[in-house]
Amino acid sequence: MEPQPGGARSCRRGAPGGACELNTATESAAPMSLAIHSTTGTRYDLSVPHDETVEGLRKRLSQRLKVPKERLALLHKDTRLSSGKLQEFGVGDGSKLTLVPTVEAGLMSQASRPEQSVMQALESLTETQVSDFLSGRSPLTLALRVGDHMMFVQLQLAAQHAPLQHRHVLAAAAAAAAAARGDSSVATPVSSPCRPVSSAARVPPVSSSPSSPVSPSPVTAGSFRSHAASTTCPEQMDCSPPASSSSTSTPGSSPTPRSRKPGAVIESFVNHAPGVFSGTFSGTLHPNCQDSSGRPRRDIGTILQILNDLLSATRHYQGMPPSLTQLRCHAQCSPASPAPDLTPKTTSCEKLAATSSTSLLQGQSQIRMCKPPGDRLRQTENRATRCKVERLQLLLQQKRLRRKARRDARGPYHWTPSRKAGRSDSSSSGGGGGPSEATGLGLDFEDSVWKPEVNPDIQSEFVVA
């Protein structure tokens, strides 16, 4: 028997049935084409494996449409695909599915938690975006919603020349509520080297340049710059590319190999304006996020682990964010080759090849000169608080005046100036003893006539007439 065209179902007479079963398995391994029709008339063509599940199909559509998979519902012949494999619902090659968006109303739309928004943002990433980010080829930008505020996070990994070593660069901005409270530990997006356990090489510093007109990037190695956000306080995070290799070791690097606990440690933190922060961090990825060779796994779980390490590092960070003046001083005083016997903080303002005690004192004095007064930030916050208090006092005073005006308008016998003038004219033309007696008593018709100092013997006709 000759094989049929295509060879998909070829088997000889008398041959064991395994050959036909093998061809059948080959058929089942081929992808099947699905036509997805939306309620608005749009059509999408997808190729999925025969054993694809409903959850996998929704994830593919979520990545393609940039919509959370929880808000996608699929119908096949008026049957909703809830869970399980597509074959269980009779879906085959060339089947047509209807995409129905999920509409939420009432309080359910406000019940989404920040953790869900982070997972939705990460799940919407394609495999190419995840691979490019973890390899250091491109930054990762996430738009997250925290309550009524929008937060933009940009994270970038810069691969180093040393094996099993990479560097994270992150700049972040806090939410509006955190900026109003002055809480600098709520958003501690930072940038720093992240090295696996076996890394022993030194990490070069990172030099940053502005990459966004809204929020400048970090200025010096291990430092951040942030910019004030708008009234709605969107969070801007900028990343800086890796600089050329240098012999200066950043805080956290060690000349001898040693094991480090998984996690991140914030090295520096800079507050540029209310709601915008940046900084540097260093740490080691968790072994679950590394493959057998020690490289980060190409998975969104690795990105989520990095974000969790950053959030955990904020609780242990104890430091006052340096101001922009201090950063400019560090940039002007930074040496070309710092002395090896000084700490990283001292070498940032030391001159060229300073090894003697005199040069050490000069470097320390330059650091003190670069540091601005520590109460400058507090003075700015105090001025803002005073302005708010004065505005509240003004609003309260205006409210008291309006309340008094309404109370006077409801009082008895309120005389307007025009009515007083008309009464004086009528009194002068009427004659008799009434006007003269009223004038002699000195009544003021603008004030209330029921004051205690008024003579009680006055008859009613002089007051009311």
Swiss-Prot record:
Instruction: Report the domain of life of the source organism.
Output: Eukaryota
Disulphide bond pairs: none
Low complexity bias spans: 195-219, 240-257
The record's PROSITE patterns line, in alphabetical order, gives: UBIQUITIN_2 (PS50053)
UniProt key word Nucleus: yes
The alphabetical list of record keywords is: Cytoplasm, Nucleus
Cite the SMART domains for this sequence: UBQ
The record, for Gene3D superfamilies, names: Phosphatidylinositol 3-kinase Catalytic Subunit, Chain A, domain 1
Positions of the Ubiquitin-like domain: 32-106
The free-text tissue note of the record is: Expressed at high levels in brain and liver with significantly lower levels in muscle.
Q: Which GO terms describe its molecular function?
A: kinase binding
Instruction: Show the GO cellular component annotation of the record.
Output: cytosol; nucleolus; nucleus
Annotated compartments: Nucleus; Cytoplasm, Cytosol; Nucleus, Nucleolus
Q: Where does this protein chiefly localize?
A: nucleus
Q: Which GO terms describe its biological process?
A: negative regulation of insulin secretion
Q: How does it assemble?
A: Interacts with GCK; the interaction occurs preferentially at low glucose levels. Interacts with the proteasome.
- Please describe what this protein does: Facilitates the ubiquitin-independent proteasomal degradation of stimulus-induced transcription factors such as FOSB, EGR1, NR4A1, and IRF4 to the proteasome for degradation. Promotes also the degradation of other substrates such as CBX4. Plays a role in inhibiting the activity of glucokinase GCK and both glucose-induced and basal insulin secretion.
Q: What is this protein called?
A: Midnolin
Phylogenetic lineage: Eukaryota, Metazoa, Chordata, Craniata, Vertebrata
